[in-house]
Amino acid sequence: MFPDIRFIVGIIGSVACMLLYSAPILTFKRVIKKASVEEFSCIPYILALFSCLTYSWYGFPVVSYGWENMTVCSISSLGVLFEGTFISIYVWFAPRGKKKQVMLMASLILAVFCMTVFFSSFSIHNHHIRKVFVGSVGLVSSISMYGSPLVAMKQVIRTKSVEFMPFYLSLFTLFTSLTWMAYGVIGRDPFIATPNCIGSIMGILQLVVYCIYSKCKEAPKVLHDIEQANVVKIPTSHVDTKGHNP
């Protein structure tokens, strides 16, 4: 019974992730239209790519037991496609300095991922230890992304404007994190449940901040764009914070 429930929860989480993955499309339509990345940061997308790569590998039978995490593998693989596309667009329109920085960071996370795959495949022969190792890498990569929602909340508090943290995105981020946390709890998988537990807490905090500052009538101050500041790992992915978001 529990495997069936877990699979259904995984499907629900995957659908939520697909919507979140596609959300930055609006941001990059703006980048393409203006032929400039302006003040946008690519770091959240690079971190999201690392998480998606790691959890794609984590879901494979080589790491997990059989296809117990098939939904994780599938949706994370889709996330790799989305994040890779966003990063490519960013690099194409970025000035030389930012272009080099992004390519260096992307190369670094790809190198770490390749080393993770190689080490877990050829140096670790115990299946359980292999799963713990890859899951730990995924856990670290996921937690590293949670500074971004804090940046968004800081901007809301500073400017007293929720313009860059839309309600429906914060709500949907919470829903997605709760779904994948339930998936991890049902399967007794701490490497999926833990990061999404943190994501759920961040989602609740965002909603609290939104409720407090949505009533403020003060005109927002001029800010640098933080659309990409609100990132969520599901079991990993990210979400932008400007109405445009595994």
Curated annotation (Swiss-Prot):
The keyword Glycoprotein applies. Residues 7-96, 133-217 form the MtN3/slv domain. Residues 1-6, 64-74, 123-131, 188-191 are extracellular. GO terms for biological process: carbohydrate transport. InterPro entries: SWEET, SWEET_rpt. The chain crosses the membrane at residues 7-27, 43-63, 75-95, 102-122, 132-152, 167-187, 192-212. One of its GO terms (cellular component) is plasma membrane. Coiled coil: none annotated. Pfam families: MtN3_slv. Residues 28-42, 96-101, 153-166, 213-246 are cytoplasmic. Forms homooligomers and/or heterooligomers. This is Bidirectional sugar transporter SWEET3a. It comes from Oryza sativa subsp. japonica (Rice).
